[in-house]
Amino acid sequence: EDIAFGPMNLGLSYDEVEKRVEDALKMVGMENYEDKTPHHLSGGQQKRIAIAGIIAMKPELMILDEPTAGLDPDGVEKVLNIMNQLNEEGMTLIISSHDIDMISKYADKIFVLYNGEIIESGNKNKIFSDMELLKKAHLRTPITTEILYNLKESGLNVNTEKISVKDTCAEIIKAKQINE
């Protein structure tokens, strides 16, 4: 019922609404929960049902506020997989989050807000390698950035704009080989 609410208000046929609800539930891995009431679901299941309600509307854009907040690791992984699949299918996602690890993995472009104002925008390497900016915005520095800054302060010539673990490891190996 909750998932069908939006599509029904679009004036779609009963069959189209049913198909959209079925497809949305399947996408979020909740196809056997169509008759459950929300208060009988876990927090992660409730989030996935809420996302299914949006998916059933077939929007071009989805705005999510802290989509992984309060979820256990399994719930986080499920929600991130759904978001990734939606993005791969062409949906634009706007995510508001303090989860630096999630944002550094999934975001293409980042806007940093402070006191309601955009104070910086750019790609994740630019944003997450700027420790002063992160401090000003009260955001946690990614562990990879901290490692690279510590190595740089120790005298290693490393590029602090590497964010992924894979790129950070490659940068450390490269710097170690140069210093040998």
Q: How should these model regions be labeled?
A:
Residues 97-98:
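H-loop/switch region of ABC-family ATPase nucleotide-binding domains
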